[in-house]
Amino acid sequence: MLTRAKKEQLVQEMTDRFSKASLILFTDYKGMDVQTISELRGQLYEKFEDKARYQVAKNTLIRLALRNASYEEEEWKEQVTGTTAILTIVDADPIEAIKIVYDFSKKKKLPVLRGCYLEKVFHDESKIPDLAQLPSREQLIAMVVSGFAAPISGLVYSLNGIISKLVYALNAIKDKKSE
């Protein structure tokens, strides 16, 4: 059993993490054994190292931390019931984390995804499959860069073609004068 001081410390740590988090994902871990939770944590650690934390805590402590971090109680009240575990992502791509947990949940049928805060905006469980389909931050950057690169590449090829024609014309003039 946790002492009062330990509980206060845990609430403070969660409050700090919730305040900085780009993603807070609420899950119901009922039916998950330690091995399954460890497997999910392993996948998250492999991708994010210490930027991701999948944490099981008492609902009363989670509620206190969410209130302290200024999240709207009407949004999360139904999420923090029963067996609750929370995934938080700090300083990393939240969409990639949603994809990992969503795919894990589809494959293992656990954990049950309840809802999330993505960049401080609440999304209920019906939106999570849509969020999991979004491209990751790296994919979006690649799309933008390729969008910028395509017109530049076209310009380079056009200029290259014009210069080649000019060189051919100058060579033709040179050959004609040398005759």
From Swiss-Prot:
Pfam families: Ribosomal_L10
UniProt record, GO biological process: translation
PANTHER family (UniProt xref): 39S RIBOSOMAL PROTEIN L10, MITOCHONDRIAL
Known function: Forms part of the ribosomal stalk, playing a central role in the interaction of the ribosome with GTP-bound translation factors.
GO CC annotations, alphabetized: ribonucleoprotein complex; ribosome
Organism of this sequence: Kosmotoga olearia (strain ATCC BAA-1733 / DSM 21960 / TBF 19.5.1)
Family annotation (InterPro entries): Ribosomal_uL10, Ribosomal_uL10-like_sf, Ribosomal_uL10_bac, Ribosomal_uL10_bac_type
Lineage, highest ranks first: Bacteria, Thermotogati, Thermotogota, Thermotogae, Kosmotogales
Keywords of this entry: Ribonucleoprotein, Ribosomal protein, RNA-binding, rRNA-binding
Family (UniProt): Belongs to the universal ribosomal protein uL10 family.
Superkingdom of this protein's organism: Bacteria
Keyword Zinc applies: no
Subunit structure: Part of the ribosomal stalk of the 50S ribosomal subunit. The N-terminus interacts with L11 and the large rRNA to form the base of the stalk. The C-terminus forms an elongated spine to which L12 dimers bind in a sequential fashion forming a multimeric L10(L12)X complex.
GO molecular function per UniProt: large ribosomal subunit rRNA binding
Protein name as catalogued: Large ribosomal subunit protein uL10
